[in-house]
Amino acid sequence: MKPLTLLVLALGLFSAGCDEVLAPATPSGVVSLASQVSGSQVVPAAGSLEAGAAGGVSVSMTPASSGAYTASFTIQLGGLVKAGVTPLLPDGSVIVAGVVYQGAAGALGSPVLQLPIGQTAAVPPLYTPTGTVLVTFSNVAVPSALASAILANPSGFYFQMHSALNAAGVVRGQLVRQ
């Protein structure tokens, strides 16, 4: 073969190999996750207070230039009242935390990302005198290692909300990719 032909073939093989090596390890663009949450999924089981609590959580994860992600959470819950009590009582439910945990369904997990509920005066606990919650949190920073782990195995993570009446957890649900 002529040297020019060998050079062209070598460059072609080299560039084909480079495409595979340079392929991104994580998906680009917004990734949507969701969770159907209920008290029956909480471990250990949620108490009889707020037993009817259920709802859904939608999560949109957007890549940032640093390899990290920002996430937006939309949370809708209902049934957050003391069982057998009129919903408008002042001692209705108070959501004190929303947390993403790493853990399998039916098992206790480790907290990996906490929403800013009740942590500052700007984001107080969510009072629910009517027994419902609809709230959105935007631009929640998700470190790159955590984002990669969640995107690789969403069902290995769950979302759980905690209330003043059920500090160990009022609703929980595993994350799933949409």
Predicted regions and their residues:
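Sec-dependent signal peptide recognition
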Residues: K2-V8
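C-terminal motif of bacterial Sec signal peptides marking the signal peptidase cleavage site
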Residues: L13-G17
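Metal-centered catalytic cores of metalloenzymes
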Residues: C18-G98, Q102-Q178
